[in-house]
């Protein structure tokens, strides 16, 4: 009787000891049935969201026995994927870029990052130094607003530096008559040419960089070029007398067009109404044969006659030119007693 009771007790203990194992096996089968047909890539995509909204969709996936731990993990990841910055950036892009008020500076409230100021509100690393009002009024024109600052990139150009460099003369800004504007190409001045570069007028005329241009006509003008400097309307008589009274040989001369003499270059208004060869009237709808631009003919025969005449005239002119050249050569040989000299 005791053996039977011991057997029953042993069986009962075995039964109670194997019950948790069976429940674990059943739970394992349940979990495997839930994730049946899933590949490893699906789990990786579930743990790699592409936007902050994917956390809610994939929050139900995971170990059902570790729900609290998975929620804490998702909360930590969601904190690193904070969407507050994205929203503020979108709102800031809708703000007018021309609004430069200091109150419009947006600072992102993030404890893990530093304050960020957008580039549209930044102008320079250091504040520009404004000039004093009387100094700018003395150097700048009247139509310029006082306290103006020239700003290029991150550097501030002072008007005083421009004056020292010589790019803008203060007399020009003040409205004086004697002024000079310097640049890399040319200089236009109304000053005395005798004091240019410390040289005299004779040295300037002998130099290869000197050129004198004289314009004749109703408004005569003499222009002197010396290097990169241009001098107009020189009033000194000494330079005018030496330069403009044919004491020096000019390189070339361009005569102005005399518009007072009639020039027969335009055809008559009715040149299409008659034949240029036989003077026959040309009616409407008839064939017209043109030659030399403004000569109209009634037939091709009349036009060919005119072409032959022009060719004979051209040949005669060439023969006369050849005869004149040969006669001049003979006369030169006679004067030189049979000795022909060449230049070179």
Swiss-Prot record:
Keywords linked to the UniProt accession: Cytoplasm, Endoplasmic reticulum, Metal-binding, Nucleus, Zinc, Zinc-finger
Induction or repression: Up-regulated in response to mild as well as prolonged energy depletion. Up-regulated by the glycolysis inhibitor 2DG. Induced by NaCl. Induced by abscissic acid (ABA).
Tissues expressed in: Early expressed in hypocotyl and cotyledon and preferentially in the stelar region of the shoot and root. Later expressed in root-shoot junction, lateral root, old or senescing leaves and in pistil and pollen of flower buds or open flowers.
Compositionally skewed regions (Acidic residues) per UniProt: 309-320
Gene Ontology cellular component list: cytoplasm; endoplasmic reticulum; nucleus
Keyword Magnesium: no
Compartments, record wording: Cytoplasm; Nucleus; Endoplasmic reticulum
Complex formation: Interacts with KIN10 and KIN11 via its FLZ-type zinc finger domain. Interacts with KINB1, KINB2 and KINB3 via its N-terminal part. Forms homodimer and heterodimer with FLZ2 and FLZ12 in vitro.
Family to which this protein belongs: Belongs to the FLZ family.
Protein name: FCS-Like Zinc finger 10
Gene: FLZ10
